[in-house]
Amino acid sequence: MDSSAKIVKPRLLHGSQWGYIDPVDTPDGGNVGFHKHLAISTKITTTIPQKHLINWLKNVGDMKLLMEISLDSILNNTKIFVNGYWVGIHNSPIELKKIFLYYRRIGCIPIMISISWSYPDNIIYFYTDAGRLIRPVFYIEDEERICSLEYYNETYNSLSDLLYGTTKRKKKINDTTFYDYEELYNKDEGKSIIEYIDVAETSFSLIAMQQEDFKETIHTHREIHPSLILGIMGHQIIFVAHNQLPRNLFSCGQSKQAVSVYN
């Protein structure tokens, strides 16, 4: 789209960009809102063959393929979509989501695969395709859980521990590979505390900003730190939360001009 086009909506900051796109690092003038930069913790997914997920859903998740069912079964069960394709149905969506999240949180399922359950439509969506933005958050299994990196500093010594737990593994985990539980573990000890979620999964989650929010309502996740909504240049701004937006925006642009390409 031409930067001279006088159109407002493509330039606006959309709510789905929270945590994924830096809200202050964008140029002024005609390109405002067109040129975007990732938040500092955002990753971009790579392709994971959907046939591997479909096989897992059938063999471990107990999903019924469309070719195996009758019309009556379709009407009375939860539909399963993978990358936009309707592949099967399931009669216990709560159990399917629970076992999927468990396997993903111990590394038996690639962390880049997302799950989102649309309750009104009774559809579970899975995405394995490339180009999706994902970001890390604390996941919450019970309201008593303390979501703080400082609290877990003595136990979790690496990003791998945070994502997959502290249980001793038989082999190094590949982020794009499916595993059987027996391939990786002999027993289940320390759980992971962080998982990556994409925009689709975020839409069906309730994410708390801080630990105190748990007292008001039930949440599914908690932010690691509010500053993670900013990108690299946004983190260079002094007292970013105390400045008006144009000052922060100018700071990002002028800081880029001041830094050599060799830095």
Please provide the spans of the model-predicted regions.
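Conduit-forming functional cores of very large proteins
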Residues: M1-N263
